[in-house]
């Protein structure tokens, strides 16, 4: 296996890692209630997706 011949400086390391960053999640407004939701997912506030309500699938079946 190849080994580095010289130590990588802090400046080179930091400049290389400067582009390695997280991107914010894209959100869209729900057409039913207007709350922000992830695209292609059911709305967390009203449970609608593509004209159908999936709220019963989101809530737990049994509550004690």
UniProtKB/Swiss-Prot annotation:
The gene is rpmF. GO terms for molecular function: structural constituent of ribosome. This is Large ribosomal subunit protein bL32. One of its GO terms (cellular component) is large ribosomal subunit. It comes from Bifidobacterium longum (strain NCC 2705). Keywords: Ribonucleoprotein, Ribosomal protein. It comes from the Bacteria. The keyword Ribonucleoprotein applies. Pfam families: Ribosomal_L32p. GO terms for biological process: translation. Belongs to the bacterial ribosomal protein bL32 family.
